Amino acid sequence: MSESFQNKAFKTKIVFDEAKPTDSDAELTAQVQFAESNTFLPEVKADDDIEEQLSHTLASKTKKRSSWFKGLLIAGAAMTGWQTVDYVVSAYQTGDWLALGWSVIVAGIATMGITALGRELFKLRRLKQRQTEREQAQVLLDADGIGQGKAFCMKLAKLSDIRDEHAGYDRWVQSLAATHNDREVLELYDQMVLSHQDRLSRQLVAKYSSEAAVMVAMSPLAVADMLLVAWRNFKLIEQVSVVYGVELGYWSRIKLVKLVLANMAFAGATEVIADTGMDMLSMDLAGRVSTRVAQGVGVGLLTGRLGLKAITLMRPLPWQPDQQPKLSEIRRDLLLKLTHKNESSKNN
């Protein structure tokens, strides 16, 4: 009796075991872990790969267009010359002296036009040759060979009109040794000879940027200022090319401007974001002083970026690591100069 009572009073122990995970629970857990460990962002290629693909695409398109354009020009010049000679001979045989006189005038004008066109094509070819030289220099730097660097640099010096009396060039020649490989030869040429041209071109960019910023900040005629700044930007690109020994014609100047703009448009995303952020900060700081000063800073920074890209395209050698000029070098000078100009104008 007592045993049955004890069995009824004390119930059997119930063990609450943890439920074993089922297949559906495993799937839900896997989905939660997948959602936490992934950010669902698309895979992005490196900026260098994108820029390289774009440069190859632009180069191929330019090569196809230039071949067709050259063929048409040669055919047109040949047909013009043939028709002119035939017209002069026919006029002389028939005794039509008036037609002969006009044909001589037309032939003279055609000769002048063909000569000018040939000169433009030569300058355009020189601009393309500079791009080829930079690619060859990159190949020599990557190959790290021996025996080709000195001849290549001497060729660059000759094309850039650098004479033996040049102090940096003479020092570079005296510094060369038989143990130097091509990479070291090109780096020495960059440091001793090309650095002088880089310094002159940077001074030009700083000068034109500050002048453009001051013109926009101080003048009330916005349209006239922008036209003048556009002309000054063309002048800046031309003078930078002269510093590096490349003479530009009309079409080569247009070609260089297109290359500069394309280079700016295809710049790496990190560089663009950094520069844009600093530009907006600079314009915000300048805007606290004056709206015109902020506009001047914006135009000056645009001119500076244009000039720096022109330097990159005109250099016969690619930039060494941590050597490429930054827009921050111009930004501070612009702010200081425009702020000083604004304060002096208010005092007057």
UniProtKB/Swiss-Prot annotation:
Protein name per Swiss-Prot or TrEMBL: UPF0283 membrane protein PBPRA2435
Residue stretches spanning the membrane: 71-91, 97-117, 211-231
Pfam families: DUF697
GO CC, one annotated term: plasma membrane
Domain of life: Bacteria
UniProt membrane topology term: Multi-pass membrane protein
Compartments where found: Cell inner membrane
Key word Cell inner membrane present: yes
Organism, scientific name: Photobacterium profundum (strain SS9)
Similarity remark: Belongs to the UPF0283 family.
Entry keyword set: Cell inner membrane, Cell membrane, Membrane, Transmembrane, Transmembrane helix
